[in-house]
């Protein structure tokens, strides 16, 4: 595995389509798609400032790092992602992804985060300002998570929530197969499946 340590990159696609990389103390400055279409990437003590850093990637681990507000829409169309001890300050993270694991992650601005994703595990994390989080997601497991945001889990399927606190009104709209264990939910719950449009008059 190639190591890139104590370096800085910017502009368009500086590490495009690279594989088997270990990044340590690397800064990705303003630009786009720094690691697009990469695979088997490990990033430790890194900072991501440019847009769309991890698009269409397969197999990457992020540890003890920061995705700034500038790294918006940062992780889309990717697979097999693990993130530990990291702050994701970027909006609209995680779209159409398969295989996401988060542990001890802070997401201060989580609005429209986790859309159309599947096979998600989130542990020991905080998701704030997270309206419409987990929309159209499937196979979601949350353990010891605090979530602040309304309209969560719309149209979600196969959701397990354990030891969590959800401050979320109008959650679980049209959701299917939801299990909540040893948790607190503050707000209205809306289970309305099947859809009213499918009911006979």
Where does each model-flagged region fall?
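Residues in short coils/turns that link rungs of repeat/solenoid architectures in beta-rich domains
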Residues: 11, 29-30, 45, 49-50, ...
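Extracellular beta-strand solenoids
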Residues: 17, 37, 56, 67-69, ...
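A generic tandem-repeat structural signature
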Residues: 53-100, 104-116
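Solenoidal tandem-repeat scaffolds enriched in leucines and small polar residues
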Residues: 95-96, 100, 109-141, 146-155, ...
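Conserved small/polar residues in nucleotide/adenosyl-binding loops
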Residues: 191-198
